[in-house]
Amino acid sequence: MASTCSGCGPGYKTPLDAMKGPREEIVYLPCIYRNTDIQKPDYLATVDINPQSPNFCKVIHRLPMPNLKDELHHSGWNACSSCFDDPSKRRNRLILPSLISSRIYVVDVGTDPRAPRLHKTVEPTDLFWKCGLANPHTSHCLGSGQIMISTMGDPSGNGKGGFVLLDGETFEVIGNWEQPGDAAPFGYDFWYQPRHNVMISTEWGAPKALGNGFNPADVKAGHYGQRLHVWDWTTHKRIQTLDLGEEGAIPLEVRFLHDPAAAEGFVGCALQSTVFRFYKTPKGDWAAEKVIKVPSKKVEGWALPDMPGLITDILISLDDRFLYFSNWLHGDIRQYDITDRKNPRMVGQVFLGGSVLKDGPVKVLEDKELDSQPTPRILKGKRLYVTTSLYSAWDKQFYPDLIKEGSVMMQIDVNTDTGGLKLNENFLVDFGAEPEGPALAHELRYPGGDCTSDIWL
């Protein structure tokens, strides 16, 4: 969604304007080699997704990082729609935090969008010494021109949910966003809504607990989170904590509605496969309620007798009509109508693989949702892109074949009128065929921004 406004900053004035933007032609994806047998650095892949191009569905450029075992994960921009009113700002640098090494790479995508180049490396010691933080995750551009990055830990691997500020021009570490001593026990994602003077952050777990895989005992030991943290956007103080309980364990991606006047949003909670709605109450504080629950399946031939869906990423359409999320273990993508914010209604579902396959080693003994799957009705609509890798340590644990074969990128055709999802069988990017060996491609970014990178003021 690249801006076409003369004299404007990056992005679009409103989310609805962004929906009218031109079709995407390329995407960027981090590709990971950590936890594979391939001793090569992670890299940024540029993929051609223009159906009219001779390179359609091909990786057209690879930018290797200068170090091994970084664990690239998510990415963000130096400037986005939050800077729309500032014509001096350009969306020309992609920010790549490294989840394990704690490096932050700044990539130049402005000089040649189809052949990105490394612009700067922020070393871990800058985060350690200047901020007392490590394991950076989510990067968001701010209206001030600065870049804010959430963290998951301290330099010793303990949980610590703080925020690093980078200068938007030099990319030097400025310091902490949060007030001294006010970091949350755990960190992961965040989203801000300045009109309500609020930011919400989430919790994954302590880096030393999740660094090499998932152990349920670590949940019982308190090494994973289950809370949302509410921050005063102006004073940078943590003003409220919402404990979601066991059903809200491991709250990952948090999404406010795109309408900057809205005072509500949703968060996907991985362990119990729930979605909570959070909202501002008439009293002016914040509350949360469970609005979606994906039942576990009773199985045999798997690690546990009950298999959760394991909700990972969630996103909201730019018109705030639909919520999408993935069940990483069950293997399906879901679409919910959220026009009734308190009562989301599933209107689309497509299965792409996962741990439950016909003639596979896992046998389903009981599935409470067996008769509730909607039939795809793709009349006209848009596109949803998905990848199969989540995080290399969990990939290795739950999908060992993914380590050997690499991940894939798929396209889902979306009915944005009445709902419906269908796999596009003419689209596939196979990262198992990469020159250095099978790679684990994770989160996508469009050069012009998208519904998880841009925040409107």
Curated annotation (Swiss-Prot):
One of its GO terms (biological process) is protein transport. GO terms for molecular function: methanethiol oxidase activity; selenium binding. The lineage of its organism: Eukaryota, Metazoa, Chordata, Craniata, Vertebrata. It catalyses: methanethiol + O2 + H2O = hydrogen sulfide + formaldehyde + H2O2 + H(+). Keywords: Cytoplasm, Membrane, Nucleus, Oxidoreductase, Protein transport, Selenium, Transport. Pathway: Organosulfur degradation. Its EC number is 1.8.3.4. The keyword Transmembrane does not apply. It is a peripheral membrane protein. It holds the Pfam family SBP56. It is found in: Nucleus; Cytoplasm, Cytosol; Membrane. Belongs to the selenium-binding protein family. InterPro entries: Se-bd. SUPFAM superfamilies: 3-carboxy-cis,cis-mucoante lactonizing enzyme. One of its GO terms (cellular component) is nucleus. It comes from the Eukaryota. The keyword Oxidoreductase applies. This is Methanethiol oxidase. It is an enzyme of class 1 (oxidoreductase).
